[in-house]
Structure formats: structure tokens, C-alpha cells
């Protein structure tokens, strides 16, 4: 239920030209904010399409966008669509990594966009793995294990006993679930 005090607080922010997402709210107000779905409460991400020489440091236009984004407390990404097109055509992982290294990049723009989007939306991925398949599930960062299990199937939440976890990097370095479990 929205309160008059809360709505007046939001109105004051908007009248002052301040996006609702930049307001300071108490926990109970944050719940009201989530229910109200104000457009300016939504997170923002600025993506600048730049030439290949401007990926790391940007250019005059992207610097203007970065200045605005700083005021709005929003992240920015410089991505070169022409480079992304070129990278998307490379199927060999080793060749892709070499090309990224030559360009002074640690990951593709698409990967950065996904990582930034997940962070901005406070999401994470968890994997379920069995003998036949491994599957990825997207959940909110604050999701508890029983609720995450319920994302797969409601019966899993009802019958939840425990979660056995291993980080993705540990899973890969150990060479699978059993070896990761054995190594602790």
C-alpha cells in the first residue's frame, strides 16, 4: 500500500528533476517503490557505439555520455559494433582469445553487456548439472536455495533438503562435480 508520505517524497524528487532511483528510501519505502513501478526508478545503462580505436578510452561523444551517466549514477559501456560483428564470426575459442588480446580487450562487448546487465539488475546464474545435461538458471542475487530450486520445479521447493554448491571456476579447474566435491 502506497502512503501519502512516500508519494510526496517521490513527487519532491521528480519536481527537483531527480530520478526516483537516486532517492534515499527506507526498507518499507523500497517495497512501495517496487510496487509503484515508476519509470525513473528503473536502472539505466548507457551503451556507446564507438570505432575500434575508442573502445578503451572512448571518444568525444562517449565522454559526453559518460558525464551524463555519472550524474545519473549509471554505468556506461563503449562497444564497437563493427568489432562485435567480426568477433561473432569466429568460432574457434583460441583464435577469439588471441584476437581479443591483440585488440587489448579481455572480453567481447556482448560479454561485458551481459555482465553489466546482470549486475545492474542484481541477477546471477546458477547451474544444475547431472550426468546427461548442465543447465543455467537466472535468479536474483538474494534468492535463497529453496526458492532457486523452486525456479526449476515447484515440487523441488516443497521437498528441498539441502544445496551442495561449488563455484564455477572451482568446478572447471577440478574437472567436474565429483572431483570438486572430493577436493572440498
Language-model features: locations:
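C-terminal-of-GTPase-core extension/linker across diverse P-loop GTPases
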Residues: 1-184
Amino acid at each position: 500500500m502506497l502512503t501519502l508520505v512516500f508519494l510526496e517524497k517521490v513527487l519532491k524528487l521528480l519536481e527537483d528533476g531527480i530520478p526516483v532511483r537516486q532517492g534515499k528510501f527506507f526498507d518499507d519505502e523500497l517495497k512501495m517503490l517496487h510496487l509503484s513501478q515508476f519509470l525513473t526508478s528503473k536502472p539505466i545503462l548507457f551503451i556507446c557505439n564507438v570505432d575500434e580505436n575508442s573502445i578503451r578510452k572512448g571518444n568525444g561523444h562517449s565522454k559526453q555520455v559518460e558525464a551524463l551517466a555519472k550524474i545519473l549514477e549509471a554505468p556506461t559501456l563503449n562497444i564497437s559494433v563493427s568489432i562485435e560483428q567480426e568477433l561473432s564470426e569466429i568460432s574457434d575459442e583460441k583464435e577469439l582469445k588471441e584476437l581479443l588480446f591483440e585488440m587489448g580487450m579481455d572480453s567481447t562487448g556482448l560479454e561485458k553487456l551481459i555482465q553489466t546487465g546482470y549486475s545492474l539488475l542484481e541477477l546471477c546464474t546458477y547451474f544444475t548439472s547431472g550426468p546427461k545435461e548442465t543447465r543455467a538458471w537466472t535468479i536474483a542475487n538474494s534468492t535463497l536455495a529453496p526458492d532457486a530450486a523452486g525456479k526449476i520445479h515447484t515440487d523441488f521447493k516443497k521437498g528441498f533438503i539441502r544445496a551442495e554448491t561449488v563455484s564455477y571456476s572451482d568446478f572447471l579447474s577440478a574437472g567436474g562435480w565429483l572431483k570438486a566435491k572430493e577436493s572440498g
